[in-house]
Amino acid sequence: MSEITIGVLSLQGDFEPHINHFIKLQIPSLNIIQVRNVHDLGLCDGLVIPGGESTTVRRCCAYENDTLYNALVHFIHVLKKPIWGTCAGCILLSKNVENIKLYSNFGNKFSFGGLDITICRNFYGSQNDSFICSLNIISDSSAFKKDLTAACIRAPYIREILSDEVKVLATFSHESYGPNIIAAVEQNNCLGTVFHPELLPHTAFQQYFYEKVKNYKYS
């Protein structure tokens, strides 16, 4: 089997723990690289956009007339390569970001798109309102056999699903906001999680994304 290269966007945010979690999979044919420019992106079979600060990441993609932003849009919508956004990364993959004009001047070009959802940033409050929850896995993928938990840090909230193509992979309950809160979604080549899977010991979502990239490359 030829090498599979998964990139982790390394402009800002929690990229090193993501890299370490993929290394934990111990797959000899898997190559993990940091992505900081268009050249790096061109080496990737799949890409992870980690948690961090979505407006900061978007500003980092704006240099040289949106060169990296445009390359990422091409990666997602033209090449249709697998991409996974966690927390802030999920925000950047969302079609609609609520009240984004209050936070940035990018307008309709704030997010890359790919997930037909409406999302709300920092829904649960500040850093002090972060929490760990149990996931209710809806997917039948073998990657998700074990009981899984999720770390939600200034997590976004998926307000609405806008297309039948969007599949819910996992939900959780919150004492203040009720049950069946969407934790993970998938639409074609795009995967989104509102939590930080790289901050807990399990590698289930890294395994799931690796399988997604492998299926893309060898389909």
From Swiss-Prot:
Give the residues the record marks as binding L-glutamine. G52, E53, S54, R121, I153, R154
Q: What is its main location?
A: cytoplasm
For this protein, what reaction is catalysed? aldehydo-D-ribose 5-phosphate + D-glyceraldehyde 3-phosphate + L-glutamine = pyridoxal 5'-phosphate + L-glutamate + phosphate + 3 H2O + H(+); L-glutamine + H2O = L-glutamate + NH4(+)
In terms of Pfam families, this protein maps to: SNO
What are the disulphide bonds in this sequence? Answer: none
Q: List, alphabetically, the Gene3D superfamilies matched.
A: 3.40.50.880
Asked whether the keyword ATP-binding is assigned, the reply is: no
Query: Family, per the entry?
Result: Belongs to the glutaminase PdxT/SNO family.
Protein name per UniProt: Pyridoxal 5'-phosphate synthase subunit PDX2
Tell me the gene name. Answer: PDX2
